Amino acid sequence: MSAIERITKAAHLIDMNDIIREGNPTLRAIAEEVTFPLSDQEIILGEKMMQFLKHSQDPVMAEKMGLRGGVGLAAPQLDISKRIIAVLVPNIVEEGETPQEAYDLEAIMYNPKIVSHSVQDAALGEGEGCLSVDRNVPGYVVRHARVTVDYFDKDGEKHRIKLKGYNSIVVQHEIDHINGIMFYDRINEKDPFAVKDGLLILE
């Protein structure tokens, strides 16, 4: 049974056992574009990927299922070489405040593509992690500070979004996965915390 057949079964909930780890060649492959109309499997896969992210951010479900918290997941991480990503960034509010929306960014993207980006680069001050990487890899992961991304939804409708800050970093991380790139490829090997002129450090 293929990975997509297993994962899209009605009763299946994606867990850490479904996520392949660094060293698996699927993580280094250029994933294939999906064609429209999507298959039922491709639609269900996107929904299951989003469901996994919601479970991973729910303390009760995460503990019950043994999940690491995640804000993004790409199909290649499930050993499915297709250009599908899911991103779920919660709204962070001051203690005691209620957010207007639960999520700052919530999207299942088919064939996402960066169509333009800022000259300025940015990196997360605390570095990046990945559900497919079980070790800590310190260093600044240098990315574009701002990006414009085109993608399609499950109905084949095209969307264009402009992203900055943390949301921009998350989406770039996931688009890297469908291009066979791991986050640590973007860390300066000789000097992991090197700061070149103009690099924006996001705390």
Swiss-Prot record:
<feature type="binding site">
    <location>
        <position position="173"/>
    </location>
    <ligand>
        <name>Fe cation</name>
    </ligand>
</feature>
<comment type="similarity">
    <text>Belongs to the polypeptide deformylase family.</text>
</comment>
<dbReference type="InterPro" id="IPR023635">
    <property type="entry name" value="Peptide_deformylase"/>
</dbReference>
<dbReference type="GO" id="GO:0006412">
    <property type="term" value="P:translation"/>
</dbReference>
<dbReference type="GO" id="GO:0046872">
    <property type="term" value="F:metal ion binding"/>
</dbReference>
<dbReference type="GO" id="GO:0043686">
    <property type="term" value="P:co-translational protein modification"/>
</dbReference>
<keyword id="KW-0479">Metal-binding</keyword>
<feature type="binding site">
    <location>
        <position position="177"/>
    </location>
    <ligand>
        <name>Fe cation</name>
    </ligand>
</feature>
<keyword id="KW-0378">Hydrolase</keyword>
<dbReference type="Pfam" id="PF01327">
    <property type="entry name" value="Pep_deformylase"/>
</dbReference>
<protein>
    <recommendedName>
        <fullName>Peptide deformylase</fullName>
        <ecNumber>3.5.1.88</ecNumber>
    </recommendedName>
</protein>
<dbReference type="GO" id="GO:0042586">
    <property type="term" value="F:peptide deformylase activity"/>
</dbReference>
<dbReference type="InterPro" id="IPR036821">
    <property type="entry name" value="Peptide_deformylase_sf"/>
</dbReference>
<feature type="binding site">
    <location>
        <position position="130"/>
    </location>
    <ligand>
        <name>Fe cation</name>
    </ligand>
</feature>
<keyword id="KW-0408">Iron</keyword>
<comment type="function">
    <text>Removes the formyl group from the N-terminal Met of newly synthesized proteins. Requires at least a dipeptide for an efficient rate of reaction. N-terminal L-methionine is a prerequisite for activity but the enzyme has broad specificity at other positions.</text>
</comment>
<feature type="active site">
    <location>
        <position position="174"/>
    </location>
</feature>
<keyword id="KW-0648">Protein biosynthesis</keyword>
